């Protein structure tokens, strides 16, 4: 599977991160002695040299705000993303499947924690981020507003949703902000396993009884377009891509990554013996890529606005969990204060 290639890319990004930390940046540039150097010049030099911006470094306010928005949205997605899969933990078809799914859902919680911690290095508290999610002031990925109707949906989420997540996130391992890049390296290694377990569920179903095969095909039919939409609006309508790429936060535009995902999935669908629900899908020899029908971007906009099939249910569930967990947070804070000899 292409997952190997993506993992290779993660390892290269990890090596580049270590190499970058060993190089120093020349911040004097070609500037004449008469001109005073600004913090903005230093920031630009670090970005241009493919070094990492660290929490202690000066950064433009807009760079900080963009990172908080993207990292928080990503963290919220991991946490909300536990719901559609958690829905199947008690109904997984065997003990082995249950144990694997439990581990995967726990991984998503872990990813949320690494990401909230990365956002906190930008000077914002986790309480504030969670409040913004619950009040609808920050977003989470559109994909988690679709329901998981059958066991095959767990396979389709692993194969397609985690597959899309990896294609989108491997370039983020090279993000210019150090704490986000480091979190992404760890997350991508785990996502690669998640994608394989989804592929394996679908492979088992597609080689099972006719009923299991139909269930697998139906799940792929329903998850294909929402997965394509995960990459965001087309570049021409993307508010942030250009500036985020100039800052080295995003490395590729939304359309480029969507295309890579399609090119990765088509041969994998053949191995599964399943079809992708797009009559327009064909090899385009001139472009050396697959031509495909894009997702319905009006639907994406509706889901992002809060009008997807499960938006209200997802947020209501999250708010309930937050309320019900209040006593745990209070007890943990009281315990920590007692141990340090202070008051909560
Ligand atoms: N859903 O200018 P654009 C996972 C918003 S976790 C909702 O292109 P950007 C997993 C966008 O925020 C998956 N909103 O934005 C977890 C912006 O609105 P605002 C999450 C979306 O940021 C558990 C507006 O549309 N992955 O995979 O440059 C289990 C214009 O868009 C979406 C990440 O978060 C969307 N799909 O690019 C299994 C990865 N798309 O904020 C799996 C990190 C766009 O101006 N994030 N919007 O009001 C990114 O890479 C980028 O933020 C995006 C969007 C590519 C998603």
State where each predicted segment sits:
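Conserved alpha-helical segments that form or flank metal/cofactor-binding pockets of metalloenzymes
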Residues: 22-40, 104-132, 199-202
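Extreme N-terminal leader/anchor segments
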Residues: 1-63, 95, 326-344
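Helix-loop segments that flank and shape redox-cofactor active sites
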Residues: 57-63, 81-103, 165-180
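Extended, helix-rich structural scaffolds rather than catalytic motifs
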Residues: 2-21, 214-344
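Internal, conserved structured core segments that host functional sites
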Residues: 146-197
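Glycine- and acidic-residue-rich phosphate-binding/metal-coordinating active-site segment common to enzymes
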Residues: 175-226
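Acidic/His metal-coordination segments adjacent to aromatic residues that form catalytic metal sites
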Residues: 52-72, 132-158, 175, 208-212, ...
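Alpha-helical scaffold segments that form or flank carboxylate-/histidine-based iron centers
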Residues: 63-74, 92-111, 154, 179-191, ...
């Amino acid at each position: 599977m292409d997952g190997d290639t993506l993992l290779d890319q993660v390892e290269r990004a990890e090596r580049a991160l270590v190499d970058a930390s060993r190089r120093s940046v020349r911040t004097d540039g070609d500037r004449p002695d008469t001109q005073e150097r600004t913090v903005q010049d230093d920031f630009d030099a670090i970005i241009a040299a493919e070094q990492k911006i660290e929490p202690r470094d000066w950064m433009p306010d807009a760079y900080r705000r963009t990172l908080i928005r993207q990292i928080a949205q990503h963290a919220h997605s991991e946490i909300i993303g536990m719901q559609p899969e958690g829905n199947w933990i008690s109904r997984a078809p065997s003990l082995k499947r249950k144990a694997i799914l439990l581990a995967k859902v726990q991984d998503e919680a872990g990813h949320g924690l690494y990401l909230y911690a990365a956002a906190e290095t930008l000077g914002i508290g986790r309480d504030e981020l969670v409040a913004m999610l619950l009040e609808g002031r920050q977003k989470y990925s559109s994909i988690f507003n679709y329901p998981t109707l059958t066991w095959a949906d767990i396979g389709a989420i692993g194969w397609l949703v985690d597959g899309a997540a990896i294609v989108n996130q491997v370039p983020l391992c090279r993000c210019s902000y150090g704490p986000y890049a480091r979190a992404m390296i760890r997350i991508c290694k785990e996502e690669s396993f998640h994608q394989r377990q989804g592929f394996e569920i679908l492979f088992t179903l597609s080689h099972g009884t006719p009923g299991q095969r139909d269930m697998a095909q139906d799940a792929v039919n329903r998850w294909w377009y929402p997965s394509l939409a995960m990459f965001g609006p087309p570049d021409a309508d993307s508010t942030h891509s250009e500036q985020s790429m100039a800052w080295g936060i995003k490395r590729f535009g939304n359309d480029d990554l969507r295309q890579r995902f399609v090119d990765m999935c088509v041969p994998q669908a053949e191995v599964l013996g399943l079809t992708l629900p797009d009559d327009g899908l064909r090899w385009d020899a001139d472009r050396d890529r697959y031509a495909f029908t894009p997702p319905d971007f009006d639907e994406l906009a509706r889901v992002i606005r809060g009008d997807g099939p499960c938006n209200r249910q997802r947020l209501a569930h999250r708010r309930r969990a937050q309320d019900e967990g209040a006593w745990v947070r209070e007890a943990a804070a009281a315990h920590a204060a007692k141990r340090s000899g202070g008051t909560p």
